[in-house]
Structure formats: C-alpha cells, structure tokens
C-alpha cells in the first residue's frame, strides 16, 4: 500500500491564496512552481511523516502536529499530522505567522 496525503479544506484554501499571491506578485510561473513544490513536499511527507519538527504548543490535543518547509519557498510552512496511511495536510502558512496564535484562533481542521 502506498503512502497518501490528504489536503484538508483550510490547507486547500491556504494553497489557493498563496498560489494567487505568488502569481500576482511575480508572475504565473512562480505561482505554478509554488504549487508544484508544495505538492512535492506533501508526497515526501506522506512517505516520511517524521521528517518535520514539533512546534512548541501547549495544547495537548495538538501533540501530533508537525511542521515542514516547502523546498524553494523556505518561508512557507506545511502544518500536518501523521495518519495511519500517510499524512493529513492541515495548513500551509508563511513562516512569519505565529503558529500558536493561528492554531488557537483559526484551528487546523
């Protein structure tokens, strides 16, 4: 059985927003490159879910949350959690955002 990744609705929305941002600021090619790099990161995480690091969050319900950088877009972070078949992609955010505040304010699901 091959490893899979599932992109949750908030992560899908994040991807749309970031792709649009890169495309409007630097051209459609950059938006497309970002989208390809993000999905490549998702595929890699699905096969090696322990690659990311644990953010320091006080909420015990988020103990399985992990973070990984998108290659070529090092300020873009993938928030995910391992699942029995691979990973669930919860959010895709800019690294300048406060992960703890974001998770508490907007959630990850």
Predicted regions located by residue number:
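Arg/Lys-rich, positively charged N-terminal/basic patches that mediate binding to nucleic acids
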Residues: 1-37, 109
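Hydrophobic alpha-helical segments of small multi-pass membrane proteins
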Residues: 36-40, 66-68
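Hydrophobic pocket/interface hotspot
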Residues: 11, 38, 45, 89
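Generic structural signal for secondary-structure transition and capping sites
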Residues: 20, 27, 43, 47-51, ...
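Enriched for short, Lys/Arg-rich terminal
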Residues: 70-109
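Short, hydrophobic secondary-structure boundary micro-motifs
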Residues: 31, 53-57, 101
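Basic/aromatic recognition patch in beta-strand/loop cores that engages polyanionic ligands
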Residues: 47-85
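Residue-level signal for well-ordered alpha-helical positions
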Residues: 18, 48, 102-105
């Amino acid at each position: 059985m091959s490893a899979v990744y599932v992109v949750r609705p908030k992560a899908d929305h994040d991807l749309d927003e970031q792709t649009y941002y890169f495309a409007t600021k630097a051209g459609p090619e950059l938006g497309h490159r970002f989208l390809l790099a993000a999905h490549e990161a998702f595929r890699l995480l699905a096969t090696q879910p322990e690659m990311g690091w644990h953010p320091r969050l006080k909420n015990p319900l988020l103990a399985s949350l992990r973070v990984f950088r998108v290659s070529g877009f090092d300020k873009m972070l993938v928030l995910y959690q391992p699942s029995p078949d691979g990973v669930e992609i919860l959010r895709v955010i800019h690294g300048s955002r406060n992960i703890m505040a974001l998770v508490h304010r907007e959630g990850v699901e």
